[in-house]
Structures are given as structure tokens and as C-alpha cells.
């Protein structure tokens, strides 16, 4: 008997791409089923509703990105290099899988309230890296939550501009500028 994992993965990928392209509201389960090459009812074997699909997909992808950044933050490198590596990672993944980041960017406001307190998230990883750098004296003092928000703004807002066509260059070409701006925020630009 099949376990349905391949079908669920196909549903998730097609849904993510359609949500990124058309928006969550405009995407129907019929659209997802057609894109995945399955019957619409098959979606309901995996999810109770489109809302549950959006929530679970967001949480899964958001946690996946948090875990990936946690690996970078856990490396035996200094804070400056860890922040640079995180931004390189973001720019590369955005360029390679724009649908994933578009989905996360465009659905985050409706989904962040669903994030469990104990989940490893990009925000928590960055905030903790900044706080650790402040403790060891490599990052300037200040509110680590505010600094994390500012660094994320430096990286995420250009991605939003890219999604909406205001920036059209290869996203990886922004890596150095974004890295230097992030370093400046946390006092690593010297």
C-alpha cells in the first residue's frame, strides 16, 4: 500500500507555486488538483481544507528555513561570517526557488501568529546570533530584536521589490550590498 508521501509532496509543491503566482485567495483546490494531476478529493486525504494546507505548508517551510539558518549559526565561524553566509544562502535560494520565498513572503502576515513558541525560525536564529555576538563583544549593543528586524528588513524588502518587479536583476547580484548593509546595522562594518 502506498503511503501518499509523493502525492502530498506534489500537492505541496504545486500549491506553493500557485499561491506564489496567483495568491492564496485566488488559488482554488481545483487549480491545485489540476496542477498536480490528481482528483480534487485527493487533496482532502492530506488536508482538511485549503486553509490547513496553507498553514501547514507555511509552518513546514518556515521551520525548514529556520533549521537551515541554525546550521549556519552553529558553524565554527565568527558572527560577521555567519551573517554573510546567511545572506548568501538567502540570495542563492531566492534566485533558485523564487516560488518558495514568494510564498513565505506573501503569506507570512496571515501565518506568523500560528508559529509555535518553540519552533526554530529564521527570526529566532538571527536574534540569538545577534544576542550571542553582543555577549561576546563582537556585535554592538542594542535591542537584539530590533536589530534582527532591521537585518531582516534589509534582506526581505528587496526580495519583495523583486517579487513585484521593481528590482529585476539576478537576486544574487545584491548579495554584497545586502551583506554590507546588515553588517552596518550590527556594527560589523569596521
Name each model-derived stretch.
Residues 102-106, 135-181:
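Hydrophobic/aromatic-rich alpha-helical bundle segments in the mid-to-C-terminal region
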Residues 66, 111-136, 145-149, 176:
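Amphipathic alpha-helical packing segments from all-alpha helical-bundle domains
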Residues 1-22, 26-35, 52-55:
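Basic, helix-initiating cap at the start of DNA-binding domains
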Residues 36-47:
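Short hydrophobic/aromatic patch on the recognition helix
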Residues 56, 70-96, 147-151:
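Hydrophobic alpha-helical connector segments
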Residues 59-66:
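Short, basic, alpha-helical segments at the C-terminal edge of helix-turn-helix-like DNA-binding modules
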Residues 20, 45-48, 60:
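Base-recognition residues in the alpha-helical recognition helix of bacterial helix-turn-helix
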Residues 79, 92, 124-136, 168-190:
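C-terminal peripheral helix-coil segments that are non-catalytic and often amphipathic
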Amino acid at each position: 500500500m502506498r503511503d501518499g508521501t509523493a502525492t502530498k509532496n506534489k500537492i505541496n509543491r504545486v500549491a506553493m507555486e500557485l499561491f506564489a503566482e496567483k495568491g492564496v485567495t485566488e488559488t482554488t483546490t481545483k487549480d491545485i488538483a489540476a496542477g498536480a494531476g490528481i482528483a480534487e478529493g485527493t487533496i482532502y486525504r492530506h488536508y482538511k481544507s485549503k486553509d490547513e494546507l496553507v498553514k501547514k505548508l507555511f509552518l513546514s517551510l518556515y521551520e525548514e528555513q529556520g533549521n537551515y539558518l541554525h546550521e549556519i549559526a552553529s558553524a565554527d565561524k565568527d558572527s560577521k561570517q555567519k551573517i554573510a553566509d546567511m545572506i548568501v544562502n538567502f540570495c542563492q535560494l531566492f534566485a533558485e526557488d523564487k516560488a518558495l520565498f514568494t510564498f513565505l513572503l506573501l503569506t507570512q502576515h496571515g501565518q506568523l501568529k500560528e508559529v509555535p513558541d518553540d519552533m526554530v525560525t529564521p527570526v529566532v536564529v538571527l536574534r540569538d546570533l545577534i544576542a550571542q555576538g553582543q555577549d561576546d563583544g563582537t556585535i554592538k549593543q542594542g535591542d537584539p530584536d530590533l536589530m534582527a528586524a532591521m537585518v531582516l528588513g534589509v534582506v526581505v524588502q528587496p526580495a519583495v521589490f523583486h517579487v513585484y518587479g521593481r528590482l529585476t536583476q539576478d537576486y544574487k547580484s545584491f548579495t554584497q550590498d545586502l551583506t554590507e548593509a546588515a553588517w552596518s546595522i550590527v556594527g560589523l562594518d569596521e
